[in-house]
């Protein structure tokens, strides 16, 4: 476990540590300690002596309480030799007993945690654990996780282990610690449903990298590791060329039935479609998604709806997670920031809202937060640098060019510079530290104009116009471009889409969607751009499709359960309770996301 050593340190303060004496008393006793007055104990470590007061040491450590009060120790004893600790660490321990603060650095955190554990000083243990959480990175996550084998740090262990699972692909590329895992440790990691990999190829490649580090001693472990890969979810070409023909696999008798079972499972999936056994078979069971796409509210059946569905991209399945206590809302905005989903503005067929609600997806609770300065239906919402931006919209009387932003820490909305044009039914996103808003309706015509907001100068700048007028548009940052998708041009709902390059200040056309739509949800999940629901010119739709910029193609995804337009989508990554929003792995009847069974209109398979 290595951490970058810096001159700076974190001084941990434990305000909630149990206290036998007041802070004032501790401060007075610390002055007496430093002056060598009224000390009644000497702690001796490797020849170094530390004067102290028994009461102060007992107040923060059960170790010292037992040491000073046990029956076999003379209560009048003054000098105690303490083994198993360095003088530097004992100095920090004693200082903490008096001040309840301790400097924690990359250089001392391991020894300090060991010392705090030895003396049962939970305040320092918690401080070291918080420090190690903040230092987690691709290079040290395995080491930190293993470090917790020796000390009781359950929250740190969980954090480190989930970091490994969530960042597996990137970690494998750079971590020297990965190559030193035991076969059992590697098996335990790659068999987890929470392992965050978009394709199972990455798991197999990680196994090969691990074996290649010590091939003579590790090649026999292929028989233990291969069954933990969801082989039937691989692209067939990769499986045949890279897995079935791999020398380690071919040389292992134990792997032969695994390969046969995988081929059979792949065949069954292609010929017969999904079955109830998909999620019970370890070769076909999709991983849990790292990020959940929420589709919130909208207009359905002639009125607003409170419906919320969660999309599991790894299983290509929607899950109804509607909270019946929540009120219906349409033409609103949604944003995810710092653990919360915010629902902003909108309309319930009677009132135009300036209200904002915040949803905690872990606790599943709703709270009202500060309202906006203006009522905003058809509002455009995006997030940048810990602020939520709300722009334009319709207040029930006029289309707006005003804009404001929300800061969660202060629970306040602040007006920013107004846009150049009035825009309702526009859409916004952020890219490279700037806010982009495109299209919309100004009360007279659908717009093809677009603007960019600079937060440093608080100024809007007009950029190159889109190639089509688009109201009810979907705008999203994807890769290095701003994508403008669908909408209404004043005559028709659109299938067309285009991408803006901030560097060139130009728009280029991309392939059209399968279905025309306006007033739909748009988000990026697993490096795919999803469009969700909307209005096709005749009716609301539950249709969903996704675009891959690498293949420059659109693909069908699983339909929502509810026909709706005027919804809003947002993506929530890294949920601790992701299983509560994902398709159930223990009782599944839906369609697993597989290259072999997902087709575009041209019958091309989903991208690898």
Swiss-Prot record:
Pfam family, one: BTB
Compartments where located: Cytoplasm
Lineage: superkingdom: Eukaryota
Tissue expression summary: Testis specific.
Metabolic or biological pathway, per its Swiss-Prot or TrEMBL entry: Protein modification; protein ubiquitination
Keyword Metal-binding: no
Entry GO terms, CC: cytoplasm
Alphabetical UniProt keywords: Cytoplasm, Differentiation, Kelch repeat, Phosphoprotein, Repeat, Spermatogenesis, Ubl conjugation pathway
Gene3D superfamilies: 1.25.40.420, Kelch-type beta propeller, Potassium Channel Kv1.1, Chain A
Domain BTB: start-end pairs: 39-106
Deletion phenotype: Heterozygous males are completely infertile because of disrupted spermiogenesis characterized by asynchronous spermatid maturation, degeneration of late spermatids, sloughing of postmeiotic germ cells from the seminiferous epithelium, and marked reduction in the numbers of late spermatids.
Kelch repeats: 292-339, 340-386, 388-433, 434-480, 481-527, 529-574
PTM sites of type Phosphoserine: 501
BP terms from Gene Ontology: cell morphogenesis; fertilization; homeostasis of number of cells within a tissue; male genitalia morphogenesis; male gonad development; protein ubiquitination; spermatid development
InterPro entries (UniProt xref): BACK, Beta-prop_ATRN-MKLN-like, BTB-kelch_protein, BTB/POZ_dom, Kelch-typ_b-propeller, Kelch_1, KLHL10_BTB/POZ, SKP1/BTB/POZ_sf
Subunit structure: Self-associates. Interacts with CUL3; indicative for the participation in an E3 ubiquitin ligase complex.
PANTHER family documented for this protein: KELCH-LIKE PROTEIN 31, LD33804P
Annotated function: May be a substrate-specific adapter of a CUL3-based E3 ubiquitin-protein ligase complex which mediates the ubiquitination and subsequent proteasomal degradation of target proteins during spermatogenesis. Required for male fertility.
Further information: Does not seem to associate with actin.
Name of the protein in question: Kelch-like protein 10
Organism from which the protein derives: Mus musculus
């Amino acid at each position: 476990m290595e951490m970058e050593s810096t001159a700076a340190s974190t001084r941990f303060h434990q305000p909630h540590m149990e206290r036998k004496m007041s802070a004032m008393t501790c401060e007075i006793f610390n002055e007496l300690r430093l002056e060598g007055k009224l000390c009644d104990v000497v702690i001796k470590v490797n020849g170094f002596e530390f004067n102290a007061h028994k009461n102060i040491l007992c107040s923060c450590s059960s170790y010292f309480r037992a040491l000073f009060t046990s029956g076999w120790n003379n209560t009048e004893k003054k000098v105690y030799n303490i083994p198993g600790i360095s003088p530097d660490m004992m100095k920090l321990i004693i200082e903490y007993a008096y001040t309840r603060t301790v400097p924690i650095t990359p250089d001392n955190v391991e020894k300090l945690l060991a010392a705090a554990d030895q003396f049962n000083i939970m305040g320092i243990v918690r401080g070291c654990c918080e420090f190690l959480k903040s230092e987690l990175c691709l290079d040290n996550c395995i080491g930190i996780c293993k470090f917790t084998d020796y000390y009781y740090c359950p929250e740190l262990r969980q954090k480190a282990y989930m970091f490994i699972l969530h960042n597996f692909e990137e970690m494998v590329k750079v971590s020297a610690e990965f190559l030193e895992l035991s076969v059992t440790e590697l098996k335990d990691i790659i068999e987890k449903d929470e392992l965050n990999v978009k394709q199972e190829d990455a798991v197999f490649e990680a196994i090969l990298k691990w074996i290649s580090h010590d091939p003579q001693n590790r090649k026999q472990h292929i028989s233990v590791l291969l069954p933990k890969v969801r082989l039937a979810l691989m692209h067939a070409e990769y499986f045949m060329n890279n897995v079935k023909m791999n020398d380690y696999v071919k040389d292992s008798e134990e792997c032969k039935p695994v390969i046969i079972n995988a081929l059979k499972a792949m065949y069954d999936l292609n010929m017969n479609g999904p079955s109830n056994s998909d999620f019970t078979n370890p070769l076909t069971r999709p991983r849990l998604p790292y990020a959940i796409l929420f589709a919130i509210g909208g207009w359905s059946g002639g009125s607003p709806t409170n419906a919320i569905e969660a999309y599991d991209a790894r299983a290509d399945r929607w899950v109804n997670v509607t909270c019946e206590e929540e009120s219906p809302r349409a033409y609103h905005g949604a944003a995810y920031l710092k653990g919360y989903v915010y629902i902003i503005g909108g309309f319930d067929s009677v009132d135009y809202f300036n209200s904002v609600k915040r949803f905690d997806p872990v606790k599943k609770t709703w709270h009202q937060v500060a309202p906006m300065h203006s009522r905003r239906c058809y509002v455009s919402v995006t997030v940048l640098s810990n602020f939520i931006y709300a722009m334009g919209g319709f207040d029930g009387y006029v289309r707006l060019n005003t804009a404001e932003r929300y800061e969660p820490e202060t629970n306040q909305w602040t007006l920013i510079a107004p846009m150049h044009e009035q825009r309702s039914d526009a859409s916004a996103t952020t890219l490279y530290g700037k806010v982009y808003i495109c299209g919309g309706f100004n009360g007279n015509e659908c717009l093809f104009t677009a603007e960019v907001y600079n937060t440093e100068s608080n100024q809007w700048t007009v950029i190159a116009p889109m190639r089509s007028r688009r109201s009810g548009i979907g705008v999203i940052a994807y890769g290095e471009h701003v994508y403008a998708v669908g909408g209404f041009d004043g005559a028709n709902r659109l299938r067309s889409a285009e991408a803006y390059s901030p560097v060139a200040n130009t728009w280029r056309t991309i392939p059209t969607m399968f279905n025309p739509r306006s007033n739909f949800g748009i988000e990026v999940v697993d490096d795919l751009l999803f469009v969700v629901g909307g209005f096709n010119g005749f009716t609301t739709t539950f249709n969903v499709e996704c675009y891959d910029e690498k293949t420059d193609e659109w693909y069908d995804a699983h339909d929502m359960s509810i026909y709706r337009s005027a919804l809003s989508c947002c993506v929530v990554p890294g949920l601790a309770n992701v299983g509560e929003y994902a398709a159930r792995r223990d009782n599944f009847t839906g369609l697993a996301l597989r290259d072999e069974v997902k087709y575009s209109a041209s019958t091309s398979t989903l991208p690898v």
